[in-house]
Amino acid sequence: MKKIIKIILISLVIIGIASVAFYFYNGTDTPKEQVIATTSFEKEIENQVKSQIQGNDYPQASKAFHDIMSTIKTEASIENVDGKKQLTTNEVANCQKIAFYAYAPIFNRYQKSYFSQSSWTDSELNALKAQAQELLSMNIAEGAAKHGIAKVIANVNDYNAAWAVVRSAHSCYSVAAVKSIKSKVAQYNRAPLTNNASLRAGLNSAYTDAKSSLASNINANCRKVAQSYMAYGSYDNYLAAEEAALNRINEYVNAFGGGSFGNAKNALAQADNDAINYYAKNY
């Protein structure tokens, strides 16, 4: 008998753990508060929710949700002849909850599915973010549901920030800027952002692109200094510019190693000789 009771208790614990896990995985399928429709309008909304939202896929459910919310808003604005609102504050809140509790799980399942895809569009991301902001503004979501909805906003913001990092990698003009790119890449090189194939490729190449951008800028600066040696007014002024250019090369090599600066160094060395002769003759 004791063995049977023990087995039953263990089974109940397992079921309980599984239920909790399912709740957090599913996000919003089990709201803490169950709304029972009592007034005729609440029941009307409940019927619309059952037929138009529940069991439908995201596009249809999303349209239905917004239509139903619009209906609630319209009815809530109507006043009776005595000046009182046609719907009480309680009715409005209950109707919104009925619609929210049916729609939020569909939204969360869709957004998880969308962020698992390898290609995203700006229009869909903006729509998801706007939808998430709208749902949170209703102040109904809580727990896992709230976390899932809020995560949409964070994901979209991080996606845009990550692309900004990728773009800025092509305009790095200092060692500090390159190191900053490396740090930011590490920050954003994670799921679900890396599910997006284009962004993943951009992040993977950003550090290399940043170093290449800096090296190109250093080489261009060396060429400019070398080619304009006659414009400095004195050899000392030219020498200061040459040393600054060489210091940038040394800083790069010390920070990252490598770098193709042979031609730049040769150009500066030749310009140094030319500058000595030029300023000796003309000043």
Predicted regions and their residues:
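Amphipathic alpha-helical assembly segments used for oligomerization, scaffolding, or translocation
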Residues: 20-21, 27-283
